Amino acid sequence: MQVPKNNIYTVSRLNGEVRQILEGQLGKIWLNGEISNFSTPSSGHWYLTLKDHFSQIRCAMFKGRNQSVSFKPVNGQQVIVKGAISVYEPRGDYQLLIESMLPAGDGLLAQQFEALKMKLAALGLFAADTKRALPKNIQRIGVITSPTGAAIRDVLHVLARRDPSIEVIIYPTQVQGENADINICQAINIANQRLEVDVLLLTRGGGSLEDLWCFNSEALAHTIYNSALPIVSAVGHEVDTTISDYVADVRAPTPSAGAELLSQDSDNKSQRLATVLARLKQSASHYQLKQERRLSLLEHRLQRLDPKRTLQQFEQRFDEMQLRLEAALTNKLHGLSRRQQQLASRLEQQSPKHKLALEANRLSYLATRLQDAMQDKLSHSGQRIKYVAHQLETVSPLATLSRGYSITTDVNGAVITSASQISLGDTITTQLSNERLMSTVTRLP
């Protein structure tokens, strides 16, 4: 036997190349097997053997990975693991480095979950550009959950503490077990038909993967995606993730976190009240200025017109505008008052009574000033109209006639200013202040 000179492997080289081949070709795999020889040394790492009826393989799961496992493995337990094949070169043993571990039942569900997740992602149901923003001023929240579970108690407690003015409408549904996903879809569809809430909160407490499985339904994913109402998914605990979390517009880690996300504390409510009152004040001021400009324009047009009838029409229009202005301002003030009362009632449990009293006094003071300013402006406008009417009467031809003058016209209505315009026997008309005279020409100069 001739020994080659340049192609002799060392043991380390052989084990290294075997490791590269195994790791490069197999990559990450899922493996089902029974645990044996399970050990937990002081390092915190796990060492075990996975076997079936015919074969076995050594496995290792390091401390950084096994801390995320939600159960304590025991010998004889069937599990599904995900990991990568590697070679432990010092001994030449090949082994599986485990990254995640699930009980055998949950493992099958996890595979189904990953498959559905990939399918829905490819259809675009998780796309960020399809997510809708939550309403800024939430008045009603629709909660889709079991009416007797811990989740609804947590949600109601948080909302009562943070913002008792928010109304809650519960759409009761089954949240675990057979047909639970169908019941949830029906509740979402009912809420979309009624359109009586601003946002939907889909929620339930924690549980095993099997307990939460109804939230991993493909039908439920499409129902959430097609909902006209924005949906917040708050299912389980922070470590739990469901398909509904991926499809929903917003995901909250717990039911309580979902309620906090959809509510504001009382301090923010007070700030919003002050902002609303300031905007209403500005709106009333702008409306008054607009009406003043309109009255000024009417006065200018009135000065360019002559007859009393036109003046009377403008006076009538002015009266109508006055009534409309008074009604508009009254409605504004009533609206401000109603809004203040509503907000005061909503904030009563948070006891912002002192701030509301100050704002109410301020509103009353502004309303009084606005009313006084309106009356002053209307009085001033009335006086100006009377002055304009007097000026029009002064230059009117009828005023000239009332001072003893007269106007004579021929049968065609032409004003006679010279005797040369008439002949003997012509009929002429003389207009006095309040009556007319008919005459026949009998003599000419």
Curated annotation (Swiss-Prot):
Q: Which residues form a coiled coil?
A: none
Predominant location: cytoplasm
Keyword annotations for this protein, in alphabetical order, are: Cytoplasm, Exonuclease, Hydrolase, Nuclease
* Enzyme category, top tier: hydrolase
Question: Which InterPro entries does the record match to this protein?
Answer: Exonuc_VII_L, Exonuc_VII_lsu_C, OB-fold_nuc-bd_dom
The GO terms this record gives for MF are: exodeoxyribonuclease VII activity; nucleic acid binding
Q: Where in the cell is it found?
A: Cytoplasm
A GO biological-process term: DNA catabolic process
Q: What does this protein do?
A: Bidirectionally degrades single-stranded DNA into large acid-insoluble oligonucleotides, which are then degraded further into small acid-soluble oligonucleotides.
Complexes and interactors: Heterooligomer composed of large and small subunits.
Protein name according to UniProt? Exodeoxyribonuclease 7 large subunit
What are the leading ranks of the lineage? Bacteria, Pseudomonadati, Pseudomonadota, Gammaproteobacteria, Alteromonadales
